[in-house]
Amino acid sequence: MKKIILIIITLFLTTGCFNYLSLNDIAVVSLVHIDYQDNKYILTVEIRENEKDNPNASSIYTNQGITLDNTFENIGLTINKFLYLVDVDTIILTENVLNQKLETTLDYITRENYIGNNFNIIVSNDDIKKITKLIKEKNKIVGAYIKETITNDYNNTIDIKYNKFIKTYLNEYKDMILPFGKIVNNEFTLNDAIIFNHNKESAIINNDYIKIYNLLNNTNKYSLFKTNYNGGNLIYRIKDVNTKYKYENNNINITIDINGNFNEIDNINLNKDNIEKLITLTKDSVYNETTSFLNILKNNNIDALGFKKIIYNKTKNKLDSIKELDYNLDIKIILDREETIFENIGAKKNEI
C-alpha cells in the first residue's frame, strides 16, 4: 500500500501537479474526523509518517475553523505541509455534523478535487482522541485499520464507500445507511449502523439487523444464524446469497436463495430426518429476523432497500411512503456439503 501511494504521489509530482511540491512538502492523510460545535468545525487528521523502521507510524493533528476549507488550511499551516487526501482511508462524521452540517460537509468533500472518493465513511460520537489512542496501541494506522475492519468479509459490517454513499444521498428513491462506531470494552467496534429517512437520521440498528441488510443487498459477509434443536445448538453459516425483488399489486415479492453450511453443531445427531428439520428451523430463523427488519423499515418509512426505485421502474409512479407496502418473503435454504461429510446422505446438496 505504501509503495502504491508513493507511486501515485510521484506521478503527480512529475506531471506538474501541486506546483512542483517535493515529497517532504506533502502530508499523506489516512483519517479525517469532522465534528461541529459552537458554530465551528473541529477537524482531526491522521498523517502517515515516512519511517523505515515503523511503516505504521502516524501523527494526529486537530484544529478548528469557521469553514471546512479554513480548518483544513489551519492544519496545513500548523505542520507546514500540503494535506494529501487523494488516498484517505476513512472519514468519520459525528452526529452533530449529520444533524447540522451534513449537506455543507458533503458538498465540500465532493467538490474538492484533492479529496479521493474511494474511502469509507462512518459515524461516531466517541472522543476521537480515545479512538486513535486505542487503535494506535495496536501499532496500526487508524484510518487504514478502520477501513480494513469494514471491508473484511469476515466482519459483518456496513461497507459503504463514499462514491456509493453520495449517490444514495442524491437519490430520491433510496435512503442512506452508515456504519456507527463506538468504543466497547476498550475496543473500537462497528457493530451498529444508522439508517436515514430522507437524509435525516432515523434509527440505529444492531449487528443482527446489519446481517439482514447485507443479506437483502446480496452482500456476502460472514453471517451466522443460530437455532436450538432438542437441547442442542446449531450455527448455520451463509456462504453466498442471491436476493431478488419483484413488485406486483402493492406487494414487494422478495426471493432469497441462501447457500451455506452448518458451522457449529452441539449435541445433535446428523441423520437425514434431523438435517431436514434443522434446515427448516434455519429457514424460520432467517424469515423471522428478515420480517422484523422489514417491519422496522416500513414502520419508520425508511426505504434503505430502494423499493421506491423498484416501483418506479415498474409503474413510472413516484411513491411518497412505503408504509402501505406489503411484503412477501420466499426463502430457500441450501445446505452445501463441500466442507462437511455426511455418511448417510449421498447427495451434494439438500434443499428444502
Per-segment meaning from a language model:
Residues 1-4:
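Positively charged n-region of N-terminal signal peptides that target proteins for export
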Residues 8-352:
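Membrane-proximal alpha-helical signals and transmembrane carboxylates
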